[in-house]
Amino acid sequence: LETRLYECTECEKTFSNQSVLSLHQRTHTGEKIFKCTECEKSFMKRSQLIVHKKCHIEERPYMCTFCEKGYNQHSKLIEHIRTHTGEKPFTCTECKKSFTKRCNLTEHLRIHTGAKPHKCNLCDKTFHYPSNLVEHQRTHTGDRPFQCTECDKSFIKMSKLMVHLRIHTGEKPYKCSECDKSFSQQSTLVVHQRTHTGERPFQCSHCEKSFSYHYAFVVHERTHTGEKPYKCSMCDKAYSQRSNLKLHQKTHESKPQQDSPNCEKTFEQESAPKTATMDQLHESAGLEKVPELPEATNSVESPEAIDDYEKNYIPWSPLSEYLGVFLPPEKQHKCTECDKCFLEKSKLVVHQRTHTGERPFKCSVCDKTFIRMVHLLEHRKIHDGDRPYTCAECGKSFIRMSKLTVHRRTHTGERPYICAECGKQFSQQSNLVVHQRIH
């Protein structure tokens, strides 16, 4: 008799019985049904749980001779010793990269094979690593578990929080070797270095013009495609640049809204004498008009021309890249401590408090102080007893949505904080920090 084979619908692997297939499918779904009663960790296999439970037993017979850490498994001790010796015995045959653990090599190999076994059940997107899937799923749930203690801003990834914290600390670890300018992000340094190298990596497939900045490239491509993604909510006009939309919206502020049969005219057509011209609007808004990109031989800007364009119309700050608004340097509100730029002076004043330590908003009940009024108002809820965020599962209520989000994990079992060393997962960031000390 032929042996019946059970096939996985995700990766087409076959198995001799249904139970083994079910066990295998958990590698795709991430399901971990075997939970430790001592801590929050859970496992795909019962055997993994049994091994894990030993870590809660005091007996750790396998001791490290370098640092005296103890382990309940010899294999764990061997893995740990490699952190002292630097040994990486598991080598990728494709790129020769080495790893201390076999499981890390297995995950790395997916980069070469293209295997993405971890699938989102909401949008069918697939990922190489389970941690990437967990991060992606937060785009659906809105969960932002990594919260800044200075300003309460929250993030999907720990790496994003770490970059954000540099705004408060002023740390700029990425230094340009050409001009000694420093940056808080490596990607920002890479883009800055193009001002020295003249590199223009963004090339238009329609006319072969090339650009140093991705934003300039995107805006240019719209001259070919006709795309106008920035739409006015007042009259349905659309523009290829956000700055043009902002300028157009000022025409609604300066005159009553009227229904017009010519609503679909472009902004360039609006510049007739009956309305303000583009130059007048730029002047009234304190903005500098964005010129046409200069023509040059081979349809690529000369180094001098692009240098002039980028220096005068794309000042080096997150401002132009993020908002698409081009401000001349004299119009910017710039922090003297970290070079961050702001559209409004009031925003700069608030930001500078992260450097000076000034906290002008004081609670009249407990004398606690805050950088921003909104933080004081949120704090006052503690004294007022206002807890507007209520758990639908158990009725417990909280002052902040972020606190409710953490609490909900006690019901859902979600553990978004993942240890990069061993894959252990936690429901709270503080628990991950404590755990990481064992590594």
Swiss-Prot record:
Zinc finger (C2H2-type): 6-28, 34-56, 62-84, 90-112, 118-140, 146-168, 174-196, 202-224, 230-252, 333-355, 361-383, 389-411, 417-439
PROSITE patterns named among the record's database cross-references: ZINC_FINGER_C2H2_1, ZINC_FINGER_C2H2_2
GO MF term list: DNA-binding transcription activator activity, RNA polymerase II-specific; RNA polymerase II cis-regulatory region sequence-specific DNA binding; zinc ion binding
Record-level GO BP terms: regulation of transcription by RNA polymerase II
Entry keyword set: DNA-binding, Metal-binding, Nucleus, Repeat, Transcription, Transcription regulation, Zinc, Zinc-finger
Major localization listed first in the record, in broad terms: nucleus
Gene3D superfamilies membership: Classic Zinc Finger
One Gene Ontology cellular component annotation held by this UniProt entry: nucleus
Region of interest (Disordered), ranges: 246-275, 285-304
A Pfam family recorded for this sequence: zf-C2H2_6
Family: Belongs to the krueppel C2H2-type zinc-finger protein family.
Protein name: Oocyte zinc finger protein XlCOF28
